Amino acid sequence: LKCSNDLEVYTIDAPSKETLEEICNIRQPVVFDFFNENLMNECNIENLETEYGAFDVNLRDNNNHDKNTEQYLPFLLKEALTIFRDGESKKYFSEKNQDFLIETGLIKKMQYNDGFLRPPMVSKCEYDLVCGEVGVKTPLRYYLNYRNYYYVTSGEINIKLVPPNKTKYLYENKDYDNYEFSSPLDLWEIQDQYKNNFDKIKVLDLTLKPGQIVYIPAYWWYTIKFTTFSSVCKFSYRTFMSSLANSPDLVMKLLQQQNVKRDMFEKIDVLKSNEKVKEKN
């Protein structure tokens, strides 16, 4: 896949389908308003908690870097939202919730309402629901999908973006088991050991509010910070050609998943950790 390294984000008003395709093909981040009433009503925090609180979502501890344990732990949505609402650890967020979307039927609503975003010759569509504690930051990472969209349905998020040509300064880690390409750098509070390289990196900052959506091209690094109690829909697409271009990485993913065994960390550990943080405060 080709990529662009210009340090700029395009902002467009009410684009047509044709205009959106043309701009996305430039491979630059794009922000635009996308007020889809069905998605805004169905996928906001209040409705999710009311209608689907008894279903499981996946919770991730952003401070857990143990490669021998599972990254994600299932929680009832109402339990996860309680942690997000009451916890002050600023380390838990939820993603990779495809099973949740299927069980609740929300995936059909996302499929019915993404025609404007879906590129031509698409071979695979992936949908996700992302939310987290106020103040939590997702890892700095990039994806290989042909198109990646993040759509804010409630709350507010901040995003930091880094172009692909700065990868050499980011200590890239390729995790084929989870198919995640990440960096240990925290762009929000840079660690001392990475400050020299951080000075060589140019960062773009975005703020997204309800009804706004961002397109993040393949190979662009990004990290999200939840500044309020927020919910975000993620739409990812592969085309036949992009899958072919990424076939070496996809093969590595399949091979790695056959060879790795991970330990499950206890659900009670998350609850105890959250209680300890509350007691300190």
Residue ranges and their predicted role:
Residues 1-213, 221-281:
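N-terminal accessory scaffold of Fe(II)-dependent oxygenases
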